[in-house]
Curated annotation (Swiss-Prot):
Gene: HTRA3
Source taxon at top rank: Eukaryota
The protein, known as: Serine protease HTRA3
Residues at the active site: 191, 227, 305
Xref: InterPro entries: Growth_fac_rcpt_cys_sf, IGFBP-like, Kazal_dom, Kazal_dom_sf, PDZ, PDZ_sf, Peptidase_S1_PA, Peptidase_S1C
GO terms assigned for molecular function: endopeptidase activity; identical protein binding; serine-type endopeptidase activity; serine-type peptidase activity
Tissue: Widely expressed, with highest levels in both adult and fetal heart, ovary, uterus placenta, and bladder. In the endometrium, expressed in epithelial glands and the stroma. Also present in leukocytes. Isoform 1 is predominant in heart and skeletal muscle, whereas isoform 2 is predominant in placenta and kidney.
Domain IGFBP N-terminal residue range list: 21-84
Keywords from the named record: Disulfide bond, Hydrolase, Protease, Secreted, Serine protease, Signal
GO CC annotations, alphabetized: extracellular region
Family: Belongs to the peptidase S1C family.
Disulfide bonds: 25-48, 29-50, 34-51, 39-54, 62-76, 70-81, 83-101, 90-126
């Protein structure tokens, strides 16, 4: 028995002696000699920590002396590589995967084939129809993405004449516009909101939003030579807005989208390309024009005037204005709109300096409410309005009864969303009937703005 044990030990020693020794790691790692394998399970460093070798995929053996380590998000369980997570996931390619590891394996394959990885969109199975996201219809529908982004800020505008005898609204013109501020400032063409009609009666502007809400509007500023106007509505809540881009950056051949409401068909969309961003007005027969227009083949119809012309980032680069013939339309560049708005703002600032009610104010925001409640637990529950930070001594507000800490919630019956609305009312209206929240009380004050000479 002892002899047999000695014999087995000798045979084992002989087998070990015949096994080739493990290759020593090089003193210096030469990555140029590393293989370039394609590994569905990902990569791990080799024993010398020099080259990357294939990791074991899900379901492959692991833990043995010659087995590769498990790949990303895998762990060795009872000799096999298993995923650390068992829940299904939805990928950005619209497919449902059994677990995160299956998605990562698919992402590695996609990277090798197309260079586009697959990301996790959500836990659980993909919603019905999401698998279509990888189809050409969804992949290349960039125009639909632009329209979805900008449509809520495009409005329909109608100009009526209120007949003095019959009380009926006689339509004079209609067109489009787009919202520039959350408080309801809208940009459109001057010819959409003005009329040379000699018929008696009072002209009225009506604005309809995409959600169907309608408001009366007033003209804030108008430049008939440039054919640009701003009008103002008083919404009950903050509105979606569009941002102005730089028309100077436009290139011929660039895709553009025109949107408006021709014939009262709201949010009618046409697309085209920019032919030129510098078509002189004199070339179009506009002798008094000093403006360069954007020429495009996007169709602009009657009623589309005043709507935005946007680039693929959803930025407004022009106002739809003229249609010469089929395939040739023109827009006022956004850089000219910016200049018009700057001049309007400068004029407002000058007028603001001439009329005042004597308060320092801040627009109510959730962060401001939290800040004020921290110092005053009895601060009222409000979601919008104007916080009176300070009342100037001997000012119209102080004489009228306004106090520090008051919250002005309405002016002349209109809810206040932004401080600019109160500033506009100070410039254009007198007296001002202010509805004020003071503690738990709702108070009314009549304030007459003073003019500074």
């Amino acid at each position: 028995m002892q002899a047999r044990a000695l014999l087995l030990a000798a045979l084992a020693a002989l087998a070990l002696a015949r096994e080739p020794p493990a290759a020593p790691c090089p003193a210096r790692c030469d990555v140029s000699r590393c293989p370039s394998p394609r590994c569905p399970g990902g990569y791990v460093p080799d024993l010398c920590n020099c080259c990357l070798v294939c990791a074991a995929s899900e379901g492959e053996p692991c833990g043995g002396p010659l087995d590769s380590p498990c790949g990303e998000s895998l762990e060795c369980v009872r000799g096999l590589c298993r995923c650390r997570w068992s829940h299904a996931v939805c990928g950005t390619d619209g497919h449902t995967y059994a677990n995160v590891c299956a998605l990562q394996a698919a992402s590695r394959r996609a990277l090798q084939l197309s260079g586009t990885p697959v990301r996790q969109l959500q836990k659980g199975a993909c919603p019905l129809g999401l698998h279509q996201l990888s189809s050409p219809r969804y992949k290349f529908n960039f125009i639909a993405d632009v329209v979805e982004k900008i449509a809520p800020a495009v409005v329909h505008i109608e100009l009526f004449l209120r007949h003095p005898l019959f009380g009926r609204n006689v339509p004079l013109s209609s067109g489009s516009g787009f919202i520039m501020s959350e408080a309801g400032l809208i940009i459109t063409n001057a010819h959409v909101v003005s009329s040379n009609s000699a018929a008696p009666g009072r002209q009225q502007l009506k604005v309809q939003l995409q959600n169907g809400d309608s408001y009366e509007a007033t003209i804030k500023d108008i430049d008939k030579k440039s054919d640009i106007a701003t009008i103002k509505i008083h919404p009950k809540k903050k509105l979606p807005v569009l941002l102005l881009g730089h028309s100077a950056d436009l290139r011929p051949g660039e895709f553009v989208v025109a949107i408006g409401s021709p014939f009262a068909l709201q949010n009618t969309v046409t697309t085209g390309i920019v032919s030129t961003a510098q078509r002189e007005g004199r070339e179009l027969g506009l002798r008094d024009s000093d403006m360069d227009y954007i020429q495009t083949d996007a169709i602009i119809n009657y009623g589309n005037s005043g709507g935005p012309l946007v680039n693929l980032d959803g930025e407004v680069i022009g106002i739809n204005t003229l249609k010469v013939t089929a395939g040739i339309s023109f827009a006022i560049p956004s850089d000219r709109i910016t200049r018009f708005l700057t001049e309007f703002q400068d004029k407002q600032i000058k007028d603001w300096k001439k009329r005042f009610i004597g308060i320092r104010m801040r627009t109510i925001t959730p962060s401001l409410v939290d800040e004020l409640k921290a110092s005053n637990p009895d601060f009222p529950e409000v979601s919008s309005g104007i916080y009176v930070q300070e009342v100037a001594p001997n000012s119209p507000s102080q004489r009228g009864g306004i106090q520090d800490g008051d919250i002005i919630v309405k002016v002349n019956g209109r809810p206040l969303v932004d401080s600019s609305e109160l500033q506009e009312a100070v410039l254009t209206e007198s007296p001002l009937l202010l509805e004020v929240r003071r503690g738990n009380d709702d108070l009314l004050f009549s304030i007459a703005p003073e003019v500074v000479m």
